[in-house]
Amino acid sequence: REHFASYENGRFQEAAAQLGLELVLRDPERYELLLGEPAGPTAFYEGEPDPAPTVLLARTGALSTPMALAVMRHRQLAGSLVLNRAAAVACAQDKLATLQRLAAAGLPVPRTVYCARLPRPALLDARLGLPLLAKRNVGSYGLGIVRCDDATQLDDLLGLLAGSPERPTDLHWQELVQSSLGRDVRVVTIGRRAVGAMLRRARPGGYKANFSSGGSVAHFPLAPPLAALAVRAAGLLGLDVAGVDLLCAEQGLQICEVNSAPGFRGFEQATGLDVPRLLLDHAQERVRLRERRRPKERP
């Protein structure tokens, strides 16, 4: 269906066909979920019974709605292997919650300020300096980010927000890491292994390195410290599959954000890796491991 048309969905369908697996695409908003039934958690999709799959690959990521998260939990309750689980997806979806969890574990993150009301300019200047970034707590594809290069731009933005009928409370303010301006490193992890890395560069004159925003990509060496940091970040959030974005700060690598359903068109272009095949192989291994651990019925 046109509703499911995307590079990633097409690649998953190709990989599943090569492996002889049945892959069915589902829109979580079209589900009806039932609890308290004798058969346990059940579901209807577009009015028809929809049995729990062996594996659910959750690909809604930062765009996950409450319904999408509910479907993930529902399928997990019904016995499906869910990659990634709802709690991990929800944490990664919230950039502030992600930074809090990483910082609490001692992992390097950019200096960040968050408050319910608009921050004091003096606080931002003292803690972050200029230029800085204002970011939505939930966002993707480089959207929801504003750069302030000087005090005038910052005052203008704060004035605009102050005059808004609904003052946004889902903003956090972050230092702009000058040494990584317009570039970052994306590491993809599957299971507890980093499978590859790419360097992302912003388009000329831009500062957002997202491939979806017109940036360029290139292969990046997956050095052990880089891989270890990405794997630890994904593990702290409980993610089986993740795209970990790292900034090259003067004092070392910093984790910018962690994505639970990373797009991989640019990643495959840069690395030559078959991401759907790697993910489906991992899912099959997880299913086999679960079957081996399941208690055998006595005759």
Predicted regions and their residues:
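ATP-binding N-terminal substructure of ATP-dependent carboxylate-amine bond-forming enzymes
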Residues: 1-83, 88
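A conserved helix-loop-beta module that forms one wall/lid of the active-site cleft
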Residues: 21-27, 72-144
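Short acidic-glycine loop/turn motifs at beta-strand connectors
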Residues: 37-39, 189-193, 249-251
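Glycine-rich phosphate/pyrophosphate-binding beta-alpha loops
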Residues: 62, 141, 259-271
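Protein kinase-like catalytic core scaffold
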Residues: 132, 172, 195-196, 242, ...
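Phosphate-binding site of ATP-dependent enzymes
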Residues: 146-234
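A short beta-strand motif that forms the metal-chelation/ATP-contact edge
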Residues: 187-189, 252-266
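A long amphipathic alpha-helix within ATP-dependent nucleotide-binding catalytic cores
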Residues: 206-255, 276-297
